[in-house]
């Protein structure tokens, strides 16, 4: 059973998501407690492969209030856990022009914190405008159909 803690809705607005992957996260005790309370922000975070390891940057986890001296640094880089084969496949794909790894959601699967990564390509401004126009048109059609019945 999955319990979703945080979603990165802005990623769907800023990027075309091509593929999705699941990875575990190496966390400290106070980070897990803080995540369980929902005190996490994925907005500006991204993942990068360095020395054959997958790392997550800029994910903000607020310090745990009862953590005192055992607390963690809120924006420290966190190691993501995936099979070496999967990491190498991702490494090849992220070397392509314009592709990046963006976290889409953070959730607990059983007792383990997992993150869903998206292989993404950045949207241009006109793509965003086009998408908004389509959404508005669909909303207008829906409104017209509702008014008719």
UniProtKB/Swiss-Prot annotation:
Membership in a protein family: Belongs to the SmpB family.
Entry keywords, A to Z: Cytoplasm, RNA-binding
MF term (GO), any: RNA binding
GO biological process: trans-translation
NCBIfam families: PRK05422.1, smpB
GO CC annotation: cytosol
Keyword check for Protein biosynthesis: no
Stated name of the protein: SsrA-binding protein
PANTHER family assigned to the protein according to its UniProt record, in alphabetical order: SSRA-BINDING PROTEIN (PTHR30308:SF2), TMRNA-BINDING COMPONENT OF TRANS-TRANSLATION TAGGING COMPLEX (PTHR30308)
Function in brief: Required for rescue of stalled ribosomes mediated by trans-translation. Binds to transfer-messenger RNA (tmRNA), required for stable association of tmRNA with ribosomes. tmRNA and SmpB together mimic tRNA shape, replacing the anticodon stem-loop with SmpB. tmRNA is encoded by the ssrA gene; the 2 termini fold to resemble tRNA(Ala) and it encodes a 'tag peptide', a short internal open reading frame. During trans-translation Ala-aminoacylated tmRNA acts like a tRNA, entering the A-site of stalled ribosomes, displacing the stalled mRNA.
Domain of life: Bacteria
InterPro entries: SmpB, SsrA-bd_prot, SsrA-bd_prot_CS
SUPFAM superfamilies: Small protein B (SmpB) (SSF74982)
Principal location listed in the UniProt entry: cytoplasm
Pfam families recorded: SmpB (PF01668)
Top-level taxonomy: Bacteria, Bacillati, Bacillota, Clostridia, Thermoanaerobacterales
Subcellular localization(s) per the UniProt record: Cytoplasm
């Amino acid at each position: 059973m999955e319990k979703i803690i945080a979603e990165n809705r802005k990623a769907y607005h800023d990027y075309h998501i091509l593929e999705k992957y699941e990875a575990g996260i190496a966390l400290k005790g106070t980070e897990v407690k803080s995540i369980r309370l929902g005190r996490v922000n994925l907005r500006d975070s991204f993942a990068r492969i360095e020395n054959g390891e997958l790392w997550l940057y800029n994910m903000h986890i607020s310090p745990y209030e009862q953590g005192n001296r055992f607390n963690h640094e809120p924006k420290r880089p966190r190691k993501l856990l995936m099979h070496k084969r999967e990491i190498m496949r991702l490494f090849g794909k992220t070397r392509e022009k314009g592709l990046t790894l963006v976290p889409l959601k953070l959730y607990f699967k059983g007792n383990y914190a997992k993150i869903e990564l998206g292989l993404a390509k950045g949207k241009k401004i006109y793509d965003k405008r086009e998408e908004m126009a389509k959404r508005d048109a669909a909303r207008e059609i829906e409104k017209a159909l509702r008014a008719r019945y």
